[in-house]
Amino acid sequence: MIRQQPDGVQTQIAQDLGSDPTLVLHRPAFCLSSMRDQPAIGLHPVSDPDVVYSFHFYEPSELTALAAYRPGLDRAALARVPFPSDDAGCRAAADSAADDATRGLMAFVCSMHWDAARVGARIERAAAWGRDHDVPVLLGEFGATRALNAPARLAWLEVVRRACEQRGVGWALWGYDDSMGFGVDPHAARRPAPGGGVSGRSVMDRATLSALGLGAVE
């Protein structure tokens, strides 16, 4: 989508909406959908309730994805980093690390003091962009790996969710039944069901649902 020329994008939006009045279009608000990047170059948002501009949020990825971009780290130690950040928890996690590279990365992450205020400031950037252009904004992806310590993961999910809701930004968790999503067991839906076939059902993690402000899902 973002490779299209701006005029072509606008023309395509008009054509898509004209072809189906029930259609809701999602367009990236930022290059590569990440708020680490600049707003999509040449994008002139269409102020239409059926066009929603989305972005992704996984910051800091050293926490939410345990720095998956960097091989050779002690991820078991990295998974102990706290959220919200606190000095004592960071020191304890660093002391457990097996190598200097992991300790250095931990020091970098902890020095940024990620907490509700910092997350809120990042989400506010997208919310402000939407207000400035009078368009709806959606956090179309966010999540944290289940390998992260549970208190940090659940706190991060709740903080991001609340930051969105406080600013009128819609949100959608990354996955349904994978390690960054709602499910306890990513293979549950594919297990054999009584009488043949597969169950087609995933077991929802109640703690995750609670962090997201959702009730029990049967």
State where each predicted segment sits.
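Active-site region of glycoside hydrolase catalytic domains
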Residues: 1-113, 124-144, 166-167
